[in-house]
A protein has these predicted regions:
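Conserved RecA-like ASCE ATPase "motif II neighborhood" in helicase/translocase motors
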Residues: 2-20, 226-229, 251, 255
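Short amphipathic alpha-helical segments
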Residues: 10-13, 37-40, 127-130, 253-254, ...
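Short, solvent-exposed amphipathic alpha-helical segments in soluble enzyme
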Residues: 14-17, 130-135, 255-260, 282-283
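Conserved helicase motor core of P-loop NTPases
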Residues: 17-22, 27-172, 183-193, 198, ...
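C-terminal accessory regions
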Residues: 165-166, 176-311
Length: 311
């Protein structure tokens, strides 16, 4: 699943450890973001290997307008004004006002809401958005304090803040990108399998509670806002997307971001920057790859071999 995220090296490893009798079923959307690392595995495979396109949207109701809206975008078309509705809202503002507007929208209805940004730095980046949202929404939450080598320390994360894990920890069943909420700071009743001291609890999006121990401290970050690469593969009831004139925001970025929403999309920025992002060719268009050529050559050899055997 989410095969558009598979890079060439990962796919090579998967193929290398299997036999010729193994069959792969790749499920993904080639219109979404290209893999972070090299290659365009799914993007090229669907142009060579027979594939099936699933065109019935399950994440959003057709009546919400979101499926039609995102179809326009993936075709490179700017949605017409009539396509904006109570489920798809553009909050037009200047770049300098984006952070304030995003924070106000989040505070008005934080439950089920995720802010998705293109970058960490900048006026619309997750760093400043997380800082501002914490100040406005949770300034009195208990700070996460701990002792290391006998010295007191603290993380700028407070009780009831949303958090995200940024590294895999297979021993604890945690994956990079797992979201949760920090709870019970200094009062955790949970213990790890090694009876380590728990500084707090983290309630995962699944409802499961896990103890926050020292070994996980460098693994968590604030998650009022997250980058799209962390959000890809996930879905949220409501998303807030700050939009600027940034080259990272291309057609596939906008399409991938907006399709994370289940019921409501709130775009913050100017219509001109939003339109430019839709018109900007996806980064995958500029990648130089060779997989398609190799696949076509292999298919041709296979076809010639079967023709020879038949004759």
């Amino acid at each position: 699943d989410e095969a558009s995220m598979i890079d060439l090296q990962t796919m090579f490893k998967l193929v290398s450890i299997t036999t010729k009798d193994v069959r792969f079923l790749l499920v993904g959307d080639p219109n979404q973001l290209a893999p972070i690392s090299a290659g365009l595995v799914l993007h090229e495979i669907v142009n060579v290997i027979p594939s099936v396109t699933l065109d019935i949207v399950k994440r959003q109701k057709e009546s919400s307008g979101i499926p039609e809206f995102t179809r326009y975008i993936v075709d490179g078309r700017v949605p017409v004004p009539e396509m904006f509705n109570r489920n798809i809202i553009l909050h037009s503002c200047r770049v300098n006002d984006i952070g304030r507007r995003v924070t106000a929208l989040y505070k008005a209805n934080p439950k089920g809401t995720q802010i998705i940004s293109a970058m960490h730095s900048g006026l619309a980046g997750v760093d400043i958005i997380n800082q501002t949202c914490q100040e406005v929404c949770n300034s009195t939450g208990r700070k996460l304090r701990f002792s290391f080598n006998g010295s007191p320390h603290y993380l700028n994360i407070r009780e009831n803040d949303p958090v995200i894990f940024v590294k895999n920890n297979w021993d604890r069943g945690i994956q990079n990108g797992t979201l949760g909420t920090l709870l019970n700071v200094g009062m955790s009743s949970l213990t790890s399998s090694l009876d380590e001291v728990s500084l707090a609890d983290i309630e995962l999006y699944t409802g499961e509670h896990i103890p926050l121990t020292l070994d996980l401290l460098d693994n968590i970050r604030l998650a009022y806002g997250i980058t799209l690469h962390k959000a890809q593969g996930s879905q949220f009831e409501r998303i807030i997307v700050p939009v600027t004139n940034n080259n990272m925001m291309d057609n596939s970025w906008i399409y991938t971001a907006l399709t994370r929403a289940e019921t409501k999309i709130e775009i913050v920025g100017s219509l001109s920057d939003f339109s430019r992002a839709i018109a900007r060719p996806s980064a995958s268009c500029y990648r130089q790859t060779h997989l398609k050529t190799l696949l076509l050559a292999e298919l041709e050899k296979s076809h010639q071999s079967s023709t020879t055997e038949t004759s």
